[in-house]
Every structure is written in C-alpha cells, then in structure tokens.
Regions:
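Residue-level signal for secondary-structure boundary sites
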Residues: 16, 61-63, 98
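Short, surface-exposed loop and linker segments with low hydrophobicity and enrichment for Pro/Ser/Thr
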Residues: 1-2, 37
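Short beta-strand
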Residues: 42-46
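An amphipathic, aromatic/His-enriched active-site/gating alpha helix that lines ligand/cofactor pockets
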Residues: 27-28, 34-40, 56-91
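Active-site-flanking beta-strand signature of metal-NTP-handling nucleotidyl enzymes
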Residues: 3-11, 52
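Short acidic/glycine-enriched loop/turn segments that link adjacent beta-strands
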Residues: 47-51
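Short, low-order "capping/linker" segments at domain edges
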Residues: 92-99
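Short, surface-exposed ligand-recognition loops at beta-strand->loop->(often short) alpha-helix junctions
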Residues: 11-23
Length: 99
C-alpha cells in the first residue's frame, strides 16, 4: 500500500502577518498534526500569494481520518484565522513512486 499526500492550497487573508502565520503553522504541525495516526511528514509551500501544505500519511484511511476530524482544536482555529477559506482547495494523492 502506498503512502498518501493530503494536499491543500489557499491564500492568506489580506493584511495578516506572515511571521505570525508561520508561527501558527509551526505550532499546529509540531503539537497536533505530527501526533496523528500514520503521520510521516508535513511541508509548507508558497508561490507568490498562493500557499500550500502537504502532509504525508501511511494510508488513505489515516489521511481521511485526519482531514475529517471534528474535535475542537485551538491550534487549527488559530491557523484557519489567517486563511481566506473561500480560496481553499484540497486533494488526496497516492504516492506512485519515490526516487
């Protein structure tokens, strides 16, 4: 079974502090995402005004369980406070090959 990438792209709200956003991402990654079942890695990307992140999980079930989690989470709430939610796009990818 191949690993799965949970990929998200989005834009930040106008006027937010990028350093504050980066701190929120770091805390979310270190204190919550990395603790999830099947977690392998987390990456944050940027191209101009478009940001993206991808989290690698061991299985599709692990990725979907994480994505569909509805437990209250102050770290996620802080992260989403920086995001223009109308710009969000999400996709799951199965890793076909790694070189």
């Amino acid at each position: 079974m191949s690993n799965v990438i949970f990929f998200n792209s989005y834009k930040l709200k106008k006027g937010v502090s990028v350093p504050d956003f980066l701190l929120a991402v770091e805390k979310l990654s270190n204190e919550y995402i990395s603790q999830q079942k099947g977690y392998i890695s987390f990456n944050l990307l940027v191209d101009g005004e478009t940001w993206a992140d991808f989290t690698t999980f061991k299985t599709m079930d692990d990725a979907k369980r994480f994505a569909e989690s509805s437990e209250p989470n102050k770290l996620a709430e802080k992260f989403y406070s920086f995001i223009n939610l109308n710009s969000c796009k999400t996709h799951y990818f199965s890793v076909e090959r790694s070189y």
